[in-house]
């Protein structure tokens, strides 16, 4: 057995099992349409105090109505009521090598929450420990209120290290290079059909990635194969573009095939098979786009094993379609599964996810429960830090509650402290064996061949103009490199631009249009987001296929039109670009930043606005440079020191070299430097300043 490959967390004390803990904060930046959840403006200091919220605990007040401060456990001193006001000044402890020093966080300045940062991987004796005891609230506490142990007036001192809360997080470790070394697909004793599919995709000499090695080795152990259903609880963590989807799909298919009851079990096996669907496994994803891509990839991997795969986001109705009886793998969003399990919402509680372009996804006859969880053996939660975060936690738990007993796999590219804490303190997850952690050595690192390019602002202050100029320069640079390397016949390079809101997407795409740069604007409520299919988005997504099975051609743009060349060489000609071209620039939000595998032609990712924190940065930047390919992330609004927002704006003269902020104003700071690889600073006109 591979020694040291996994780390088991200590069992929770029996007393803690008597209480309930909701997740503190969310690691989710995904709301409907890729928008961030709206928050009520903070009250002024002279505004009247609110009535105690303890009286409202039985109410069904929506999360969107909850004041920002109460979400984060901020309360005024001397009262038990939650109040929407900025936090008071707090002591911040610095663990610099020169010694510890204390500073005061200015009043009214929001300290980043502990869930919006990356888990530090240090030896257990150096992990910061809070000075206070971690207290769990009684089960009567409603899920929309924050545990009092993180309130400001509970009489407990809270420590901060480098401006971040010292979260009471159990330690965990990464696998080492030897444990995660590449191995051939034949080394693990996988089902023959799965090995054949893997070799068809990655070649006869193909080898595993680190997270695939860890996962395949663990799930093919003899004791795992014979373990009872419900005993397997695994957390898979690896950097973006490292094969996490394969790392959970292959073991899942391996065990489903080993326990396949055979062709004798048909739809007629179930008494109510004409009306319901009985999946053997469920895969949850945060978005319809990711669900569709995972469904397509799952069908490719099971081509030689003949397992049945059904994706709910691939149907026009958004449900199970005409599928009934038994199915091996069912993929869907949390909202889709809630519907199919019969957990409907009132009109006031209906999510925007239920609508696309103003039309309902669901057909009336599919609003009632059409899926039964009695036969589910495996549940996979993809992008677990999102689905177990604030915005999706209650819905995710409600779906899991419909499954009587199943093995559980969590998959994530970022591991915020709240997730580990949740899995080791929440009774929902501590009723059984502790989670086994399979963490890649490269977790919380950007892809090794991804170049980070910081763009200094121009003296004109026209950021959108700078973006358009950088788009032209980047595509020209890619065309020149392709010509030099003899790759002129390949698909032209593409760019994905991330914005923080739908409105910003509209603004950026409009400016690019005026600059004769045709682009695809993709938002939750966008005109090109279709029900049941990706449409023009397929131009930018990976299209895997087995030998002899060519991938479906991506759909052309809805309104193809002639476009002028967006760049020309010295002779005035446009290299490798036809007069009628597909769109090569995608402008979107965080809606597409989670889990999606973009086509190799996507060479660059642009971050037009500063990301909210390092988690956002890692996920957005990780859409390029995937699977060992070179790529670049072009960053606007952040200088090379990692300063965000106002810190970048305050740099006069377009220098972009302001001092690194360490006052807790943002969550990047030192953590940004930890995830970056190769980097360079470029002026607004494209001249390299330094590397």
UniProtKB/Swiss-Prot annotation:
Keywords of the record: ATP-binding, Helicase, Hydrolase, Mitochondrion, Nucleotide-binding, RNA-binding, Transit peptide
Catalysis performed (reactions): ATP + H2O = ADP + phosphate + H(+)
Biased segments, Basic and acidic residues type: 50-68
Major location category of this protein: mitochondrion
Pfam families assigned: DEAD (PF00270), Helicase_C (PF00271)
Domain Helicase C-terminal: 474-691
Polar residues biased stretches: 39-49, 111-126
Domain Helicase ATP-binding: 225-433
Any single GO BP term: ribosome biogenesis
Compartmental location: Mitochondrion
MF annotations from Gene Ontology: ATP binding; ATP hydrolysis activity; RNA binding; RNA helicase activity
InterPro entries named in the record: DEAD/DEAH_box_helicase_dom (IPR011545), Helicase_ATP-bd (IPR014001), Helicase_C-like (IPR001650), P-loop_NTPase (IPR027417)
Region (Disordered): 31-148, 644-667
Family: Belongs to the DEAD box helicase family. MRH4 subfamily.
PANTHER family with a match to the protein in the record: RNA HELICASE
Domain-related comment: The Q motif is unique to and characteristic of the DEAD box family of RNA helicases and controls ATP binding and hydrolysis.
Protein's name according to its UniProt entry: ATP-dependent RNA helicase MRH4, mitochondrial
């Amino acid at each position: 057995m591979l020694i040291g490959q996994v780390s088991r967390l200590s069992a929770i004390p029996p007393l803690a099992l008597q209480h309930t803990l909701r997740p503190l904060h969310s690691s989710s930046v995904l709301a409907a349409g890729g928008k961030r959840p709206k928050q009520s403006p903070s009250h002024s200091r002279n505004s009247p105090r609110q009535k105690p919220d303890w009286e409202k605990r039985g109410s069904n007040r929506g999360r969107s109505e909850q004041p920002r401060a109460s979400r984060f456990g901020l309360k005024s001193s001397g009262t038990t009521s939650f109040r929407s006001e900025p936090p008071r000044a707090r002591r911040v402890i610095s663990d610099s090598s020169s010694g510890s020093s204390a500073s005061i966080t200015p009043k009214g300045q929001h300290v980043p929450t502990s869930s919006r940062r990356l888990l530090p991987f240090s030896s257990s004796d150096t992990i910061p420990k809070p000075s206070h005891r971690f207290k769990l609230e009684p089960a009567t506490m409603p899920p929309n209120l924050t545990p009092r142990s993180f309130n400001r007036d509970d009489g407990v001192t809270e420590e901060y290290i480098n401006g971040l809360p010292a979260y009471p997080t159990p330690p965990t470790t990464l696998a080492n290079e030897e444990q995660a070394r590449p191995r051939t697909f034949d080394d693990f004793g996988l089902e023959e059909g799965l090995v054949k599919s893997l070799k068809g995709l990655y070649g006869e000499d193909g080898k595993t990635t680190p997270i695939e090695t860890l996962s395949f080795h663990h799930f093919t152990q003899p004791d795992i194969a014979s373990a009872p259903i419900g005993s397997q609880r695994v957390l898979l963590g690896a950097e973006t573009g490292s094969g996490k989807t394969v790392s959970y799909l292959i073991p899942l298919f391996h065990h489903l095939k080993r326990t396949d009851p055979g062709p004798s079990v048909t739809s007629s096996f179930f008494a109510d098979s004409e009306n319901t669907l009985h999946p053997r496994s469920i895969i949850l994803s945060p978005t319809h786009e990711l669900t569709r891509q995972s469904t397509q990839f799952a069908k490719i991997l099971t081509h030689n094993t003949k397992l049945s795969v059904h994706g709910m986001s691939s149907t026009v109705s958004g449900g199970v379609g005409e599928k009934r009886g038994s199915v091996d793998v069912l993929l869907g969003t949390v909202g889709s599964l809630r519907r199919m399990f019969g957990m409907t919402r009132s009109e006031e509680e209906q999510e925007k996810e239920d609508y696309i372009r103003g039309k309902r996804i669901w057909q009336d006859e599919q609003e009632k429960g059409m899926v039964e969880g009695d036969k589910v053996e495996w549940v996979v939660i993809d992008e677990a830090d999102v689905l177990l975060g604030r915005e999706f936690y209650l819905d995710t738990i409600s779906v899991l509650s419909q499954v009587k007993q199943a093995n559980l796999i969590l998959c994530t590219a970022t591991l915020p402290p709240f997730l580990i804490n949740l899995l080791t303190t929440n009774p929902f997850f501590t009723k059984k064996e502790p989670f086994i952690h399979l963490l890649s050595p490269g977790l919380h690192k950007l892809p090794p061949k991804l170049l980070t390019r910081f763009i200094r602002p121009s003296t004109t202050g026209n950021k959108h103009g700078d973006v358009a100029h950088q788009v032209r320069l980047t595509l020209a640079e890619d065309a020149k490199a392709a010509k030099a390397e003899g790759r002129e016949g390949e698909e032209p390079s593409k760019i994905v631009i991330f914005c923080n809101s739908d409105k910003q997407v509209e603004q950026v795409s409009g400016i690019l249009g005026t600059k004769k740069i045709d682009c695809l604007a993709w938002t939750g409520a966008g005109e090109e987001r279709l029900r049941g299919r990706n449409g023009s988005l397929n131009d930018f997504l990976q299209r895997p296929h087995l030998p002899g099975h060519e991938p479906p051609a991506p759909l052309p743009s809805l309104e193809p039109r002639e476009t002028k060349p967006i760049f020309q060489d010295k002779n005035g000609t446009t290299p490798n670009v036809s007069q009628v071209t597909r769109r090569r620039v995608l402008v979107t939000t965080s809606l597409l930043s989670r889990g999606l595998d973009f086509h190799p032609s996507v060479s660059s990712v642009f971050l037009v606005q500063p990301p909210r924190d390092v988690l956002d940065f890692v996920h957005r930047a990780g859409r390029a440079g995937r699977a060992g390919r070179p790529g670049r992330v072009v960053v606007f609004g952040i200088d090379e020191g990692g300063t965000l927002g106002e810190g970048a704006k305050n740099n006069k003269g377009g220098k972009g070299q302001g001092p690194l902020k360490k006052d807790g104003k943002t969550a990047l700071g030192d953590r940004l430097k930890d995830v970056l690889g190769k980097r360079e600073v470029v002026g607004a006109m494209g001249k390299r300043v330094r590397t």
